[in-house]
Amino acid sequence: MPRVVLNGVTVDFPFQPYPCQQEYMTKVLECLQKKVNGILESPTGTGKTLCLLCSTLAWQQHLRDAVSSLKIAERVQGELFASRTLSSWGSAAAASGDSIECYTDIPKIIYASRTHSQLTQVIRELRNTAYRPKVCVLGSREQLCIHPEVKKQESNHMQISLCRKKVASRSCHFYNNVEAKFLEQDLATPILDIEDLVKNGSKQKMCPYYLSRNMKQQADIIFMPYNYLLDAKSRKAHSIDLKGTVVIFDEAHNVEKICEESASFDLTPRDVASGLEIINQVLEEQARVTQQGELQQEFIVDTSSSGLNMELEDIAKLKMILLRLEEAIDAVQLPGDDRGVTKPGSYIFELFAEAQITFQTKGCILESLDQIIQHLAGRTGVFTNTAGLQKLMDIIQIVFSVDPPEGSPGSLVGLGISHSYKVHIHPETSHRRAAKRSDAWSTTASRKQGKVLSYWCFSPSQSMRELVCQGVRTLILTSGTLAPLSSFALEMQIPFPVCLENPHIIDKNQLWVGIVPRGPDGVQLSSAYDKRFSEECLSSLGKALSNIARVVPHGLLVFFPSYPVMEKSLEFWQVQGLARKVEALKPLFVEPRNKGSFSEVIDAYYQQVASPASNGATFLAVCRGKASEGLDFSDMNGRGVIVTGLPYPPRMDPRVVLKMQFLDEMRGRSGVGGQCLSGQEWYQQQASRAVNQAIGRVIRHRHDYGAIFLCDHRFAYADARAQLPSWVRPYLKVYDNFGHVIRDVAQFFRVAQKTMPLPVPQAVTSSVSEGEIALKDATLSSYSLSTRKAMSLDVHVPSLRQKPIGLPAAGDSESSLCGEYEQQTFSAQQRPMGLLAALEYNEQKAGASEEQALGSSTPSLRCEKRLSTEQKGGRKKVRLVNHPEEPMAGTQAGRAKMFMVAVKQALSQANFDTFTQALQHYKSSDDFEALVASLTCLFAEDPKKHTLLKGFYQFVRPHHKQQFEDICFQLTGQRCGYQPGKRELESKLTLSEGVDRQLDPGQHLNQGQPHLSAHPTSKGHTSHCTKVGCAVEKPGQPAVSDYLSDVHKALGSASCNQLTAALRAYKQDDDLDKVVAVVAALTTAKPEHLPLLQRFGMFVRRHHKPQFLQTCADLMGLPTTGKDLELEGPRDESPTVPPELTHEDLKPGPSMSKKPEKTQSKISSFFRQRPDESVRSDDTTPKPMQLPPRLPHELMKPHRSKQ
């Protein structure tokens, strides 16, 4: 590799660096050698990541060589080098004037970026260099943990708590193997990223999370996300020592926002209520254990400890603190216009002091909260959601992050913090509450609107100064969009002696930039608030897009100011037919809101652009979104970028308003207005930086070329043009006529395609791991499955999506219990005409059962098969071949392959590996119980994956099919199509028979035989009528969903939530009296609700059914003979349970080990244990729980907080 000497340091570079790259590396070395901070801006595509790595590692190697030479000189006591001066051993040591002792430990390099995907790209660049340092990548347990039990935890903090428990008790064998295998050569040598760590950890059976932490001690360069550095809690959790280190923030335009967000919080009524519910649950459990003396039996969870080591009085005090905090927030008077009130930052200490949360008590409170979270770690179910408690812990740590000096009051600290913080209290709106609802208590009826407590930091200097105070040697901030550098440095409030604003490395014929103020119809293009949704603007923008798509080759990127603007535009274009015109030119791909679907969509876009038969593709995204940050759209993937407007922050958002006020106050207080940003300047800068990030997608390397379209008339203003990158402004041109835009762009691309070298052919770029790239091999027609699904606009745009009839509303609590039941689709099959049609009809009929099971989970697969048939003229062609290379999509093997693709898309890589291992084990051992246990963990907990469990029916062997269908119905409420009384066919005479015989027998579970099918039945479920009421199940809908829907209609949302909560509790504790008490209280108030009590029998477990029958007879005044009263539900040997109840719950527990004695239960016994219920019987009154004498009685009442 070429070598270049810069500032006395020899740098190995993969190629001869360009002048701007040499200048960039010179500035980096200047920062390192002088031990000063630097802000370095270099346009995207100039190779700043490569320059950063090569220059810093070259300096580190140079320093290491210098120190080694000095140590050799000392060892020989100066005999060999007595005449040499210190400066001759290297400028790095001499220039700084440090003694030899300062370099005993070579400074570590900490390289931080926004996301792990960006860090993966950086590590990929590192592998292309000549340097081979010791590398460490830090990640979270969510990314690195491979322990099955820990991975199943729903939240990150629960994973942390359970992991710590297992590590402390030495019960995690993956952790135990780390120390033994850490020093093995194959792990210490290579450069590992996150995916490599997980692969090696799984292979070596050791924990990747703690492996990376051990590697950190010996690493030369450590990679981590921003928040690990900027958040004091994360620094402490990962034991990051910054003293003497070199810290590099890549993509540093996000640092300001991350600094402010890491020091801010929003406390909602839901968070307080969640914490109170958990504390109340623990309080009741501890009181019960204290009374019964059964502490050891009730609370041992995976450890040898005796349980929660807290007194009842301490738990009660903790509950009282949260109640007082809630009361203090509610006591704040708000104006009647829902705007909220703003107070200085020091007010947070006054508010918390009312709840007895102070500098003196914070330690005890944090310790108590941590004990409860650790105690509940590993439990499952909705009532162990400790997210609220974890958030309270984080809030207390943020507020009291700076301890006052000894002997001084905490009020002095509060006065100092008030300059950077504001407290904002505002009412919680119903739409926010519905949008964030994810747990049982969030839908509890509230008569009084709750209030949100916000504590916002408006100065990034708060976190940055704290970072520098840790002893950082050099801090380097770099990005492609930092200008203006002076204002950026002022916001950080730390010195940056070294600054650089680099030009680009491209020539004039590689970039075209045009401001397009009007569309083809002459209508002014604007994304201003009053015009963005007007039909004239939307229509003109759509016409402009369709015209630009005609002249821009290959990939075209379109960036909108926000998701609502993009979705509204797409909705309008769909109605007006404009989207269809663009689709005909370049298929549309839409950036999804959720992170999980993004990799699928972007990979499909890459594949579409790379297809030789296509004209490219159009990718619709949003500024500040995932596509605008760090993704590679080089060469054909991004020949054009359209920016449809200026993405200003929401002007009326309280946080934006307060930020602008804060900057104006700071500017007035400083007295030097020209040196500080005003609020309006910051507001404009936020929009321009987002635009500049989007623009940076088009030019990614020296020989790349592309066009930039700024489609908003406000880009023509002088202040907006001045905010554009310096390397873009020389190419800028304002067009008054849209026709001239098309003319010039067409000419630009004609010249560029003739003069610029052809891009080097590369593999299809992917944003996911290598294991997930295998999905692209499952192409079923001219486009892959992922491409088909990604091109479905209604999948990613909610406004275009039709809501299925009969599904519960998104906010209903029963939806979380039932899951999402997809409706069955029935299509009338036409009578086959002709021989070919008859053959195709027979094949489709033979595989109807498996295809139905698969099709309900992946609608895109049905579309795929239909489109494939349409492209072939609506009739399947039959070709006789001897050795087909891969199965056809219509065969059994083809459907199996489609199912595996769907499973791999739905599961993570680790879970998919578990799935394949379960398949292999079932094939070799025929162990059906082990198979069901594995499938239950993978598919039963998430309602969205229920149809995948149903689709697995095609792989089940004949003698297990009926048993599998019963289990599937119990877990999901869906049947697989098994027909009792009909023998499963052992072979099929279909067109795919020859194909199946050629397949590798290892792909089949039935000893190499074809997959067996079962024909679906359309008769539906048998209904059971009784004297009380009769319920007829609707075809294709589970009985559970019908019942909960009827409860919701009859009793209301609050009562339905109460019933589902009791049902979940019954699932866990098997306490029939408790659940019947709730159901009876809800359904016996009115005679017309009594059938709901009788129908509840579908949930009652088998050993409880006689007792439940007797109870129903007593409550409804019916005869007590079992012949006269029957329970509704399936008449099988297994109890009917809601879909969320897993297969493990069907196994006998401690309370189910033997059949209970038959007792005569009265309604009074049900209410005796429910002091919080208001329903009373004629012959009894509720009795409160017996408490220890010293415990306040009112604290044992269940808290009904505002939600």
From Swiss-Prot:
Residues 1123-1134, 1169-1181 have a biased composition (Basic and acidic residues). A motif (Nuclear localization signal) lies at residues 151-167, 871-877. Its main location: nucleus. ATP binds at S42, P43, T44, G45, T46, G47, K48, T49. It is an enzyme of class 5 (isomerase). The PIP-box (PCNA interacting peptide) motif mediates the interaction with PCNA and localization to replication foci. Belongs to the helicase family. RAD3/XPD subfamily. This is Regulator of telomere elongation helicase 1. It comes from Mus musculus. The gene is Rtel1.
